Amino acid sequence: MVWKGIYRSGYPSKRNLTFLRTLGLRSILFLCPEDYPDSHLGFLEECGIQLLQFGVVGNKEPFDEIPEDVLRAALDAVLDQTNQPILIHCNQGKHRTGCLVGCLRKVQRWSLVAIFEEYRRFAGSKARVVDQHFIERFQPSAGAARAGALPRALPARA
């Protein structure tokens, strides 16, 4: 759990779908450009879960740019309470998901130290400097923290 009503994971397998059903999800935010598999689309339809897809190509090269406009749009979707409870995922739940969650943490006014600690906890030995630079440079828009987007009592982590 990232925050109440906001979850993260790697790509859910078929065996994970039963657990996902227990979360009462309204939305799944998929951060990859590939088509969602038919088996999963059937599950989403059966459960009334909407698929929000923001296709971010994996950034394995050190100088590949993360598309800020796409991540901003994805962040707006995460912050929209009508989409919650929401699951954010990419293929591994490390890099693309980590960047989006890192941007959310900036909206929540977490310190960079805490944001990077969380990012590295999920990315492990595969942490990417380019992702951390993206998070560091990201400036939340005034609209991102609009009233009602997240509960008023946001924890500020040191």
Model-derived regions, located:
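Cys-dependent protein tyrosine phosphatase-like superfamily
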Residues: M1-I88, Q92, C99-A158
